[in-house]
Amino acid sequence: DTIEGKLPQKKIVREAARGYSSYGNQIGLATGYVKEVYHPDYVAKRMEIGAVMGAAPRRAVQRLTSDPGDKIILLGGRTGRDGIGGATGSSKAHNTQSTSVCGAEVQKGNAPTERKLQRLFRREEVSHIIKKCNDFGAGGVSVAIGELADGLRVQLDKVPKKYAGLDGTELAISESQERMAVVVSPSDVKTFLGYAAEE
C-alpha cells in the first residue's frame, strides 16, 4: 500500500532498477546484483541495494603513505552545484514534493567519464605509480583530499568546474561519482597525466 505523501512502491522499484541498469549499460558493466529488502522499518519504501564489484590482481594494488612534497591530482568529471548536499539529502525525510527540491542535491551521472576512469585504473602501469587514491563521494574535495594526507594545501581555484561562479564552499563540498583524487610522487606527475590523457 502507498502511504499518503509517499511515492508508490511500484514506481520506486521500477525506476530504481531502470536507473541502475541504464548506468551500468553505459559504462559497459553487467549490473548483476540487485536486492530488495523487505522489513517493517522500510514501510514507506523498500530498500533497494545494487552493487558492481571490481577486482584486480594483488600485484597491481599498493597502499603507501603520502610524503611531504607529493602531488594530488584530480581527474574525471568537473565540479558543479548538482553534487552539493547529496549525502545529507539521502538522510532527510521525503515526500511527493521532494523530487522538485532534492533532485538538485544529487550529482548528475556521467557514465562515459566513469568508464574512462575504470579503464585508466585497470592498467597496472598506472596503478603502480598511485600511492593513495580516494573518490569524491560524500563530502567532495573536503573529504576526498582531506583523507589523503595529514596536512596539505588545497588550491580550490584549480578544481575543474562545469561552469563559472562557484564559490569556495561549493567547490569544497560538491560530490561526484566520476572524480578521483590520486597521490603520486612529483617525479611521476608527467607520466600519470600522460596515461590519463590517453583515455
What are these regions (language model features)?
Residues 1-199:
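Glycine/proline-enriched, intrinsically flexible loops and inter-domain linkers
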